Amino acid sequence: MKKFINKVNDIITESLCGFASVHSDLVTLHLDPNFLTRNNKAQNKVAIISGGGSGHEPLHTGYIGYGMLDAACPGHIFTSPSPDQMLAAAEAVHAGKGILFIVKNYAGDVMNFEMAAEMLSFEHEIGRASCRERV
């Protein structure tokens, strides 16, 4: 046996539910769209959000916590999260001091995070700045 998979279509939801139940003291799972947030919403600081394709757990969700991410948006296996996931996560953790998206340099991640940033600027009048650093 190489993998523990009940149903292929449920793998992301089951994985997130398992992670959230094991770390219920730290994170809250939001479904439809899928994203996780810190239990203790940070106040008076810039909200930090990241995400990316699932399949490398606990890559994004494992960085949620004090002094680290406020939210993580896991996409499907090796697929970028949707702009709707990022928008919902941003709305959940925004504390009035701005939002910083940490984006890895994958075309889908860059495109979808940029779309989410544009949606935020239109729907919530949150200013938008862009910085790209090739690493």
What are the residue ranges of the model-derived segments?
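Glycine-rich, flexible N-terminal cofactor/catalytic loop recognition
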Residues: 34-66, 73
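Short Gly/Thr/Asp-enriched flexible loops that form oxyanion-binding sites at enzyme active sites
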Residues: 110-123
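Residue-level detector of conserved catalytic or cofactor/ligand-binding positions
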Residues: 125-135
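Glycine-rich phosphate/diphosphate-binding loops that line cofactor/substrate pockets in enzymes
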Residues: 35-44, 87-97
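N-terminal amphipathic/basic leader segments beginning at the initiator methionine
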Residues: 1-48
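A short, small-residue-rich loop immediately preceding and capping a beta-strand
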Residues: 97-104
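Gly/Ser/Thr-rich loops at beta-strand to alpha-helix junctions
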Residues: 53-58, 104-113
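Glycine-rich oxoanion-binding loops at beta->alpha junctions
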Residues: 56, 60-96, 132
